[in-house]
């Protein structure tokens, strides 16, 4: 059980027999009436996102979630194969469970796999990942029709928007949560 004051991003709640993870939350104290907590919850299995409001101080069931450090090995059809660094056990996780983070995963990347009762729930990548630009068009000096950005394809196949000065072969820092360009890595 957790109180609304214990809410934080990533906390997994058990509501009506389903597992939901908190993606956003905000404590609200209106001028009139009691305080409450506004949340965005993501269903762990289906990926559906809903808005839910809790009265302040309400107790909510939490799920026991184990986070294990693992290494991403390879992609096999519709599954991703991960290895536990301690036991060398390999597990197969479906594309749906891995989610959007798959577009930023490189082989041998260290990730965290969250499990509930030995069932993989989701995969957490490092917040920032370093990836090489496979292809991007040369940026034309003075071209501002695109707001100073252009598309670039990364070594994983993901496509993100980057500033005009980025060239093919540059190593970039990318936010794995939303795919935003963070900067160039100095070689």
UniProtKB/Swiss-Prot annotation:
Subcellular location: Cytoplasm
Keyword annotations: Cytoplasm, Elongation factor, Protein biosynthesis
Stored InterPro entries: Elong-fact-P_C, NA-bd_OB-fold, Rib_uL2_dom2, Transl_elong_fac_P/YeiP, Transl_elong_KOW-like, Transl_elong_P/YeiP_cen, Transl_elong_P/YeiP_CS, Transl_elongation_fac_P
Gene Ontology BP terms: peptide biosynthetic process
Keyword Protease: no
Pathway: Protein biosynthesis; polypeptide chain elongation
Classification via SMART domains: EFP, Elong-fact-P_C
Molecular function GO labels: translation elongation factor activity
GO cellular component, one term: cytoplasm
Entry's family note: Belongs to the elongation factor P family.
Function in brief: Involved in peptide bond synthesis. Stimulates efficient translation and peptide-bond synthesis on native or reconstituted 70S ribosomes in vitro. Probably functions indirectly by altering the affinity of the ribosome for aminoacyl-tRNA, thus increasing their reactivity as acceptors for peptidyl transferase.
Family matches, as HAMAP family: EF_P
Protein name per the record: Elongation factor P
Organism annotation: Rhodococcus opacus (strain B4)
Gene: efp
């Amino acid at each position: 059980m957790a109180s609304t004051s214990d809410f934080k991003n990533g906390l997994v709640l058990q509501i009506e027999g389903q597992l939901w993870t908190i993606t956003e939350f905000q404590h609200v104290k209106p001028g009139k009436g009691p305080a409450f907590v506004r949340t965005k919850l993501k269903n762990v299995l289906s990926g559906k996102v809903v808005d839910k409001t809790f009265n302040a101080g309400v107790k909510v069931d939490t799920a026991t979630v184990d986070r294990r450090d693992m290494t991403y090995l390879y992609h096999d059809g519709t599954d991703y194969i991960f290895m536990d660094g301690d036991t060398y056990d390999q597990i197969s996780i479906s594309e749906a469970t891995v989610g959007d983070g798959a577009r930023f995963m490189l082989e041998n990347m260290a990730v965290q796999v969250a499990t509930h009762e030995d069932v993989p729930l989701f995969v957490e990548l490092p917040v920032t990942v370093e990836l090489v630009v496979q292809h991007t068009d040369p940026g034309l000096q003075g071209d501002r029709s695109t707001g100073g950005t252009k598309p670039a394809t990364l070594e994983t196949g993901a496509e993100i928007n980057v500033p005009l000065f980025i060239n093919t072969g540059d190593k970039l820092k990318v936010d794995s949560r939303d795919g935003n360009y963070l900067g160039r890595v100095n070689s």
